[in-house]
Protein backbone atom coordinates (compact mmCIF):
# COMPACT_ATOMS: atom_id res chain seq x y z
CA UNK A 1 0.00 0.00 0.00
CA UNK A 2 2.72 2.52 0.91
CA UNK A 3 4.65 1.83 -2.30
CA UNK A 4 2.07 3.72 -4.35
CA UNK A 5 3.12 7.14 -5.72
CA UNK A 6 0.46 8.89 -3.60
CA UNK A 7 2.09 7.76 -0.35
CA UNK A 8 5.56 8.81 -1.54
CA UNK A 9 4.40 12.27 -2.60
CA UNK A 10 2.08 12.90 0.33
CA UNK A 11 3.54 11.47 3.52
CA UNK A 12 1.40 12.02 6.61
CA UNK A 13 2.96 14.62 8.92
CA UNK A 14 0.99 15.39 12.09
CA UNK A 15 2.67 17.34 14.87
CA UNK A 16 1.44 18.03 18.40
CA UNK A 17 2.78 21.02 20.29
CA UNK A 18 1.84 22.71 23.53
CA UNK A 19 3.04 23.87 26.90
CA UNK A 20 4.94 21.49 29.20
CA UNK A 21 2.60 19.23 31.16
CA UNK A 22 -0.40 19.75 28.88
CA UNK A 23 -0.58 16.06 27.91
CA UNK A 24 1.47 15.61 24.73
CA UNK A 25 3.16 12.42 25.91
CA UNK A 26 -0.12 11.08 27.31
CA UNK A 27 -1.75 11.67 23.92
CA UNK A 28 1.15 9.98 22.09
CA UNK A 29 1.02 6.94 24.40
CA UNK A 30 -2.74 6.76 23.92
CA UNK A 31 -2.34 6.77 20.14
CA UNK A 32 0.16 3.90 20.35
CA UNK A 33 -2.34 1.93 22.42
CA UNK A 34 -5.31 2.72 20.18
CA UNK A 35 -3.54 2.00 16.89
CA UNK A 36 -2.50 -1.56 17.66
CA UNK A 37 -3.67 -2.68 14.21
CA UNK A 38 -0.73 -0.81 12.67
CA UNK A 39 2.96 -1.63 12.93
CA UNK A 40 4.21 1.36 14.91
CA UNK A 41 7.85 2.22 15.42
CA UNK A 42 9.38 5.09 17.30
CA UNK A 43 9.84 6.39 20.79
CA UNK A 44 8.45 8.54 23.53
CA UNK A 45 9.92 10.10 26.64
CA UNK A 46 8.87 9.57 30.23
CA UNK A 47 9.65 11.76 33.19
CA UNK A 48 11.86 10.46 35.98
CA UNK A 49 10.76 11.84 39.35
CA UNK A 50 12.40 11.71 42.75
CA UNK A 51 10.50 12.95 45.79
CA UNK A 52 7.94 14.63 43.54
CA UNK A 53 10.50 16.58 41.51
CA UNK A 54 11.34 15.89 37.86
CA UNK A 55 14.99 14.83 37.72
CA UNK A 56 15.26 13.52 34.19
CA UNK A 57 13.77 11.66 31.26
CA UNK A 58 13.78 8.11 29.93
CA UNK A 59 13.91 7.29 26.22
CA UNK A 60 11.27 4.59 25.68
CA UNK A 61 11.36 2.54 22.48
CA UNK A 62 7.82 1.58 21.53
CA UNK A 63 7.58 -2.12 22.37
CA UNK A 64 11.24 -2.55 23.30
CA UNK A 65 12.46 -1.11 26.61
CA UNK A 66 13.92 2.15 27.87
CA UNK A 67 17.20 3.86 28.67
CA UNK A 68 18.25 7.22 30.17
CA UNK A 69 17.87 10.32 27.98
CA UNK A 70 18.58 13.20 30.35
CA UNK A 71 19.17 13.83 34.03
CA UNK A 72 19.91 16.58 36.49
CA UNK A 73 22.95 14.42 37.36
CA UNK A 74 25.92 14.56 34.96
CA UNK A 75 25.36 11.72 32.46
CA UNK A 76 26.70 13.47 29.35
CA UNK A 77 28.58 16.53 28.15
CA UNK A 78 25.69 18.45 26.58
CA UNK A 79 23.08 20.36 28.57
CA UNK A 80 19.59 21.61 27.86
CA UNK A 81 18.36 23.83 30.66
CA UNK A 82 19.10 22.07 33.93
CA UNK A 83 19.44 18.63 32.33
CA UNK A 84 22.54 16.79 31.18
CA UNK A 85 21.80 14.89 27.97
CA UNK A 86 23.31 11.47 27.22
CA UNK A 87 25.98 11.35 24.53
CA UNK A 88 24.37 8.34 22.83
CA UNK A 89 21.33 6.11 23.24
CA UNK A 90 21.86 2.39 23.78
CA UNK A 91 18.47 1.49 22.26
CA UNK A 92 18.79 3.43 18.99
CA UNK A 93 19.58 0.26 16.96
CA UNK A 94 16.23 -1.21 18.05
CA UNK A 95 14.41 1.91 16.83
CA UNK A 96 16.19 1.76 13.45
CA UNK A 97 15.35 -1.92 13.03
CA UNK A 98 11.66 -1.37 13.79
CA UNK A 99 11.46 1.63 11.43
CA UNK A 100 12.18 -0.58 8.43
CA UNK A 101 8.88 -2.46 8.76
CA UNK A 102 6.71 0.23 10.35
CA UNK A 103 3.40 1.44 8.93
CA UNK A 104 3.53 4.54 11.15
CA UNK A 105 6.31 6.33 13.02
CA UNK A 106 5.48 8.00 16.34
CA UNK A 107 8.00 10.24 18.10
CA UNK A 108 7.80 12.17 21.37
CA UNK A 109 9.45 14.57 21.52
CA UNK A 110 11.32 16.34 18.76
CA UNK A 111 13.02 19.21 20.53
CA UNK A 112 16.27 20.81 21.68
CA UNK A 113 17.16 17.87 23.95
CA UNK A 114 16.83 15.31 21.15
CA UNK A 115 18.77 17.60 18.80
CA UNK A 116 21.80 17.41 21.14
CA UNK A 117 22.13 13.63 20.63
CA UNK A 118 23.81 13.33 17.23
CA UNK A 119 22.69 9.82 16.25
CA UNK A 120 19.13 10.42 17.43
CA UNK A 121 18.92 13.72 15.55
CA UNK A 122 20.18 12.01 12.36
CA UNK A 123 17.52 9.33 12.79
CA UNK A 124 14.77 11.95 13.27
CA UNK A 125 15.92 13.87 10.19
CA UNK A 126 16.00 10.64 8.19
CA UNK A 127 12.45 9.77 9.21
CA UNK A 128 11.19 13.27 8.40
CA UNK A 129 12.78 13.15 4.94
CA UNK A 130 11.37 9.67 4.22
CA UNK A 131 7.94 8.70 2.93
CA UNK A 132 7.01 7.10 6.27
CA UNK A 133 3.86 8.57 7.87
CA UNK A 134 4.75 10.42 11.08
CA UNK A 135 2.90 11.58 14.18
CA UNK A 136 5.12 13.42 16.65
CA UNK A 137 5.10 15.88 19.48
CA UNK A 138 7.38 18.81 18.80
CA UNK A 139 8.83 21.50 21.01
CA UNK A 140 7.31 24.91 20.29
CA UNK A 141 10.68 26.18 19.08
CA UNK A 142 10.97 23.57 16.31
CA UNK A 143 9.91 24.54 12.80
CA UNK A 144 8.94 21.30 11.07
CA UNK A 145 6.68 21.17 8.04
CA UNK A 146 3.35 19.41 8.50
CA UNK A 147 -0.06 19.82 10.11
CA UNK A 148 0.35 21.21 13.61
CA UNK A 149 -2.03 20.80 16.54
CA UNK A 150 -1.69 23.10 19.57
CA UNK A 151 -2.72 20.94 22.54
CA UNK A 152 -4.49 22.58 25.48
CA UNK A 153 -6.42 21.16 28.44
CA UNK A 154 -9.62 22.28 26.69
CA UNK A 155 -9.04 20.66 23.28
CA UNK A 156 -7.24 17.40 24.21
CA UNK A 157 -10.12 15.07 23.30
CA UNK A 158 -10.88 16.87 20.04
CA UNK A 159 -7.22 16.84 18.98
CA UNK A 160 -7.04 13.10 19.71
CA UNK A 161 -10.11 12.46 17.57
CA UNK A 162 -8.82 14.71 14.77
CA UNK A 163 -5.48 12.88 14.67
CA UNK A 164 -7.15 9.45 14.67
CA UNK A 165 -9.40 10.58 11.82
CA UNK A 166 -6.41 11.88 9.83
CA UNK A 167 -4.67 8.51 10.28
CA UNK A 168 -7.83 6.66 9.22
CA UNK A 169 -8.13 8.76 6.07
CA UNK A 170 -4.47 8.30 5.26
CA UNK A 171 -4.58 4.53 5.54
CA UNK A 172 -8.05 4.35 3.97
CA UNK A 173 -9.54 2.47 6.89
CA UNK A 174 -13.11 2.43 8.08
CA UNK A 175 -14.20 4.76 10.87
CA UNK A 176 -14.72 1.89 13.30
CA UNK A 177 -11.32 0.22 12.76
CA UNK A 178 -9.71 2.19 15.58
CA UNK A 179 -11.55 2.64 18.84
CA UNK A 180 -12.34 6.07 20.15
Swiss-Prot record:
Reaction(s) catalysed (UniProt annotation): a ribonucleoside 5'-triphosphate + H2O = a ribonucleoside 5'-diphosphate + phosphate + H(+)
Lineage: superkingdom: Archaea
Residues reported in the UniProt entry to bind ATP: 18-25, 104-111
Pfam families per the UniProt record, alphabetical: NTPase_1
The entry's keywords: ATP-binding, Hydrolase, Nucleotide-binding
UniProt xrefs under InterPro entries: AAA+_ATPase (IPR003593), Nuc-triphosphatase_THEP1 (IPR004948), P-loop_NTPase (IPR027417)
Gene3D superfamilies: P-loop containing nucleotide triphosphate hydrolases (3.40.50.300)
GO molecular function annotations of the record: ATP binding; ATP hydrolysis activity
Keyword Flavoprotein: no
SMART domains: AAA
EC number: 3.6.1.15
Keyword Hydrolase assigned: yes
Function summary: Has nucleotide phosphatase activity towards ATP, GTP, CTP, TTP and UTP. May hydrolyze nucleoside diphosphates with lower efficiency.
Family that this chain belongs to: Belongs to the THEP1 NTPase family.
Name of the protein described by the UniProt record: Nucleoside-triphosphatase THEP1
The species this protein was found in: Metallosphaera sedula (strain ATCC 51363 / DSM 5348 / JCM 9185 / NBRC 15509 / TH2)
Amino acid sequence: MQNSPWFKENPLRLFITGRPGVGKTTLIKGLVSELRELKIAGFYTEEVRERGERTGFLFVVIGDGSCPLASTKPIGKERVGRYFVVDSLTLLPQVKQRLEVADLVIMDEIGPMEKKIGDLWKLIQGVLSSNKPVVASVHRSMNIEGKRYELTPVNRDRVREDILNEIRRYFGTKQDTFSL
